[in-house]
Each structure stands twice: as C-alpha cells, then as structure tokens.
Curated annotation (Swiss-Prot):
Organism: Mus musculus (Mouse)
Region (Interaction with UBQLN1) residue spans: 197-262
Compositional bias segments (type: Basic and acidic residues): 224-237, 364-376
Keywords, ordered alphabetically: Isopeptide bond, Phosphoprotein, Proteasome, Repeat, Ubl conjugation
Expressed in which tissues: Isoform Rpn10A is ubiquitous whereas isoform Rpn10E is mostly expressed in the embryonic brain.
Gene Ontology annotations for the cellular component aspect, listed alphabetically: cytosol; nucleoplasm; proteasome accessory complex
Domain notes: The 2 UIM motifs are involved in the binding to a multi-ubiquitin chain in a cooperative way.
UniProt cross-link Glycyl lysine isopeptide (Lys-Gly) (interchain with G-Cter in SUMO2), position: 122
InterPro entries: PSMD4, PSMD4_RAZUL-like, UIM_dom, VWF_A, vWFA_dom_sf
Protein's name in the database: 26S proteasome non-ATPase regulatory subunit 4
GO molecular function, one term: identical protein binding
Entry similarity comment: Belongs to the proteasome subunit S5A family.
Length: 376
C-alpha cells in the first residue's frame, strides 16, 4: 500500500453557484471530495489529507490529517466568492506538503477546477516543471468550464508527466447529474495504489466496503433489516384493517338482504291467503274453492302446472279471456255445468252459498253497468 499525503484544492469561486451539476457545482464538488478523502484514508490508515480553497487568498482549511470528519466539516463551511488563482493555490498546497510529518510519504495534489483559469499557459508550464522536480504529482478534475480550461490544463499535466510519466492525471467531466460517479471510475481513484478504492458505491452493499469498515457495514445491514420488518408489519396491519372493514360491511349487507327477503315474504303472506291443501278437500269443497277464487278475481294455478300451458295462457287473446270471465260470472251457466258434473251434488250447502254470492255479485254488476250507461 502506498503511503501518501494529499492536499485537496477546492474551487470556491462564484462559478460554483451554477446548476449544470446537480444540485450545484459546489455541492457536487463536496460529494466528490468526500469520496476522495475516504479513498485516500482507507487505502492506508497512515495516509493524510489536507484541504485548501483556490479562490481569493487560497485559505488552508485543514492541514494534513487522517481525520476525514474534520476535513468534511470544514468543507461544508465553504461559500462561493471571488475568482480562483490556480497557480497560487497549487504553490500553497505544495508548501503544505513540505511540512508533512511522514517524510517517506509521496506528495500528491488533487485540484478541483470548476471556473476559468486566468493564469497563462507559460506560467502553468513553469509551475509544472518545478513540481516535477520536487516529485509532486497533481490530479486535476476539470468540470464546468472544460472548453476554456482543457488546453491549458492538458499542457500542465503533460509537463508534469514528461515523456514516460503517468503519475498525474487530468479528468475532464462534462455536465451531468453526478460528478462523484465520474470521479469513481477515473484513474485518480483507480490509479497507483487505488485499485481497490476505485470501486463505486454500487459495487458494495449499502455503498460500504465490509472489509474496510465491517462495523458500519453491519450497522447498515441491521438497520435495513429492521426497516424491512417495520414495513412488513405495517403492510400486515393495513391488510388486517382493510379485511376487518370488509368483514363488518359484509354482515351488514347480508342482514339487509335478509330483512328485505323477510319483508317480501310477509307482504306475500298478508297480501293473500296461503294455498290450502287440496288433497285433503272433497270434490265439492274443491269446486267451491275454485268458484270463490274466481269471484275474488285471483288467478290460481298449481306449482305442478305445465309451463307450456301457462305460456299459452299468457299469449291468449285478451278479448277471449274477457268473454270467459263473463261466462264464469253467469250463475245460470254455472248451475247447468254443476248439474251435469258426475258425482257433484248441486244442493250441497257449500255450493249453494257460493252460487248465492255469485248471483248477488252479478246483480250488483248489472246495476253498476246500468248506472254507467245512464251517465253516458
């Protein structure tokens, strides 16, 4: 594992307010710096990282330290202001690296450039030659203003590397949703000593390498399991509640249906008398009952009647039904029919009472017909 001290230079100019990187260039840069700091410290526990701003006075926010929490807390206090002074910032970072505690540490500067570099190319090349002599590697993340800066920064990095050198890198990132994702797959994190650290967050469960931080990975796994159990419990409760509501509504519906059915049965029972047991009646009683039903105008049919006969009755001529009804209301006609029926005694008390009622009904109907004709 490579022992290395790294100074991270962040761009905090007014250009960092732009939103071509979500949500802004400044916040996208913060996420990328977070990844860089963790990558360097995890690659070797003895590695140190420092933080410096490039705008205005090039302020050193933190000196070299293995404490990434301290670095990130300072990083989130950075606010956009002024313009960057690239060459000055690189010189200050180089000076900070000279004061590193581990003299056997290699020196590296990682610079984020998200605004136009106003230094001319000649000054950049001169600075690169000096850094190469001091064996300082520089990685540059060029984003936001790549059209303006790419040519200058390419000359700077090529001078650092020389003909055969590969220690310094220039990564140009076009506008997009994530600066950090582009940085993860870049040679800056996957280069010398950083092969393990070039893995993206999607390559590990919960974005954490279990071998690097087993306690954090375990805590995240337990937290996710608890969250899954809570969601399943909430889903079961919701299903039980909906089932309970459906269970309450269903008996209510059945009760209302039963009540409606009982009401209909009661109406049928009180609206007309039930059918008598014809098998227990004598022939005279059956004839008397038939005549009584005819007088009341109630149609009577047995449940065992043939369907074809009933359909024929439904489709019969209305005029014919009216004639049959008039004939059945004629007492003399009925008397003659009863006398000709075998086994029927016309002098039976039940038959005579029905015939008397029929005669009186016919008399009333005749009077009513006369009154209606007189009114006309």
């Amino acid at each position: 594992m490579v022992l290395e001290s790294t100074m991270v230079c962040v761009d905090n100019s007014e250009y960092m307010r732009n939103g071509d990187f979500l949500p802004t260039r400044l916040q996208a840069q913060q996420d990328a710096v977070n990844i860089v700091c963790h990558s360097k410290t995890r690659s070797n526990p003895e590695n140190n990282v420092g933080l410096i701003t490039l705008a205005n006075d090039c302020e050193v926010l933190t000196t070299l330290t293995p404490d990434t929490g301290r670095i990130l807390s300072k990083l989130h206090t950075v606010q956009p202001k002024g313009k960057i002074t690239f060459c000055t910032g690189i010189r200050v970072a180089h000076l900070a690296l000279k004061h590193r505690q581990g003299k056997n540490h290699k020196m590296r500067i990682i610079a984020f450039v998200g605004s136009p570099v106003e230094d001319n190319e000649k000054d950049l090349v001169k600075l690169a030659k000096r850094l190469k002599k001091e064996k300082v590697n520089v990685d540059i993340i060029n984003f936001g203003e790549e059209e303006v800066n790419t040519e200058k920064l390419t000359a700077f990095v090529n001078t650092l590397n020389g003909k055969d050198g590969t220690g310094s890198h220039l990564v140009t990132v076009p506008p997009g949703p994530s600066l950090a994702d582009a940085l993860i797959s870049s040679p800056i994190l996957a280069g010398e000593g950083g092969a393990m650290l070039g893995l993206g967050a999607s390559d590990f469960e919960f974005g954490v390498d279990p071998s690097a931080d087993p306690e954090l990975a375990l805590a995240l796994r337990v937290s996710m399991e608890e969250q899954r159990q809570r969601q399943e419990e909430e889903a079961r409760r919701a299903a039980a509640a909906s089932a309970a509501e459906a269970g309450i509504a269903t008996p209510g519906t059945e009760d209302s249906d039963d009540a409606l059915l009982k009401m209909t049965i009661n109406q049928q029972e009180f609206g007309r008398p039930g059918l008598p047991d014809l098998s227990s009646m004598t022939e005279e009683e059956q004839i008397a009952y038939a005549m009584q039903m005819s007088l009341q105008g109630t149609e009577f049919s047995q449940e065992s009647a043939d369907m074809d006969a009933s359909s024929a009755m439904d489709t019969s001529d209305p005029v014919k039904e009216e004639d049959d009804y008039d004939v059945m209301q004629d007492p003399e006609f009925l008397q003659s029919v009863l006398e000709n029926l075998p086994g029927v005694d016309p002098n039976n008390a039940a038959i005579r009472s029905v015939m008397g009622a029929l005669a009186s009904q016919a008399t009333k109907d005749g009077k009513n017909d006369k009154k209606e004709e007189e009114k006309k």
